[in-house]
């Protein structure tokens, strides 16, 4: 397989922890370059066992046709080393039990925080994972997560950049509990314009700026719990912001491949990808709802999430499907971890402006995003205190 050299910026860990500003970020990034060897062709997996070699243009053409895939060129081992607990053995609570505790926390969720964060996040020309803007936006996001932990006085919690060879790092925030059993809440931070990824604008307000700021707000409010702050929860909680989802779930594959190798005990993973668009549902005369994905997910976790929505959200759920490898929860599933995915609506009514210059804030509902934040916060708290085998 032939390869070609592509120059990409090197985003240092020191800068990652300190960067908060666009101009500062660019000044640092331009001082350092990293030579990365990019393959001429990529091995993708379109369904279990169905693989194909494609070039980069062919990858984007598949995405334009709404065909999803894993890019397994450098992640072929994902799912092959899983000798830990079978994901099917995880038993979830029969029902939510922390209604009284969560009631005051849910009132703390603020859609204005989500709007402010999303306005900045979408101001980057693109968050394409192989661009300087993608590195800068990741630096800004890492700064916001750091600030969230600091403002909460979360001295036991931590956040780190998970580096990748393409430049844009993933981000992992960890709130330790009494055990290493882990609950993961995820979203992807990158965006893409499929018509010319390296150059055209990709504000990515809904995909997946909405999920990014939704889980950030859930993290902020979760840290208002003294029990969580003091590490008194039964389980550890992690918040992930994945790089390069649009390239074939690259960032999440790298993370869950490392977790699989380390035999990490992940009890649940929820993905929040696209949480803000509701207009097409309303135009169809349907009630506002959230879409619970039912294919290629863990049935037990999905059933518990349905109960969470019923108890803690002000709108109902609908059952819907999104296909194979449709978001980062698929990487967790492939590694043997139980995962679930909740999207903004029935999949057929989801945002069609994604992957273009028109994926803008003006088309989103922050009231709807608040419902996703309620679900995320409630699930994280309920499972933080759940007792697993």
From Swiss-Prot:
- EC assignment: the record states 3.4.11.-
- Which Gene Ontology molecular-function terms are recorded? aminopeptidase activity; metal ion binding; metalloexopeptidase activity
Q: Tell me the compartments it is located in.
A: Secreted
Q: Which SUPFAM superfamilies match?
A: Zn-dependent exopeptidases
Residues spanning the signal sequence: 1-18
**Chief location:** secreted
Alphabetical list of InterPro entries matching this protein: M28_fam, Peptidase_M28
**Would you list which residues are glycosylated?**
99, 146, 156
Keywords (alphabetical) are:
Aminopeptidase, Disulfide bond, Glycoprotein, Hydrolase, Metal-binding, Protease, Secreted, Signal, Zinc, Zymogen
A GO BP term here is: proteolysis
Q: Name one GO cellular component term.
A: extracellular region
Q: What does this protein do?
A: Extracellular aminopeptidase that allows assimilation of proteinaceous substrates.
Assembly and oligomerization: Monomer.
Report the protein name in the record.
Leucine aminopeptidase 1
Q: Which gene encodes it?
A: lap1
